[in-house]
Amino acid sequence: QGHEIDPMAVNGLEQALQIALTTSQFYRAEEICDLLIMDDPVNLELLETMRDLTLYNGNYEKSLEIVGKIEKLKGVDSNLLIQKSALYEELENPGLALETMYIAFEQDSQNVDILHRLVTLLIGQERSQEAIIYNQRIIDNHPNDSRGFINNAVMAMSGKKPEEAIQVLQPHEERFSQDFTVQYLLGTAFYQIKDFINSKLHLSKALSIYPQSRNTKHNLALIHDSTGDWVESDKLYIDLISTDSTDAQAYNNYAYSLVERDRDFEFALELAQNAIRLEPKSAAYLDTIGWIYFKMNNFDEALRYIRESLNIDSSNETIKEHLNEVIKVRAKVNGQAIQQVENQD
């Protein structure tokens, strides 16, 4: 039984809801929708609007409550169970998220969305053997759905087996030539085994499918760096920085690329300073700025930053090599300076 509200007031609230939705005042819309549901608690359209609003506003506890009400009116279906599972995951309850998907699987064991969601949760909870079993159902029953092959590749990559990921995806690359994730994973796997030609090929395809992918641009820039194609890597770094002034990784990688080429030390230093400003406790970024100071013969600053970097990541071999190089060169330069003074005397 709903609370009785004057019909004129209901009409006014409905108009207010439409205005709030049209003007993107979603928190206000949620408040108004809540009032309307109090008057008409079995109005499915209102409940679905409320669910969408609470999801957008990140009010996941409320979303879960609303999905439960929708479920009572419509009955249990796979989409609602998937939504409930996703909400449990957002609310950091992985056990209930998985339990909900087992219920969904019992109701429809061939549904590819249920299977994929189940596999994704199992991978996330490091239950790879179970994930493999359910994922095989996707491959067997839905061979034209790329997600089964992608899941196997993701598990291989998670296990640091890029060659296995390539073996999983490469036989199907033509069939999924316009699938961003397939091309991206192939490019990343080839990059990890230092096959830069194939890596560049697949990541370029991925970028053509989804030009806004920043991860793809980052990886392509690293490959162009590795192959000495610096015109292309510089273009990508400039694009990344110009489209997101908070991309610390782009600042750092561009700076490191320049200093490794012995180019534009002042500009590289400016880039590295931006990276440090954004992420002051990053061992990699502290090492980069220290290495730039070393190349600029400012050994004291170089030592300060690289030692700080090593304190954060004491097992990093590159940072250790940089520190040893700075100490060695500084000792040599200081020795030469002392020798010159003695010769003058």
What residue spans do the PLM features occupy?
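Alpha-solenoid helical repeat scaffolds
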Residues: 1-345
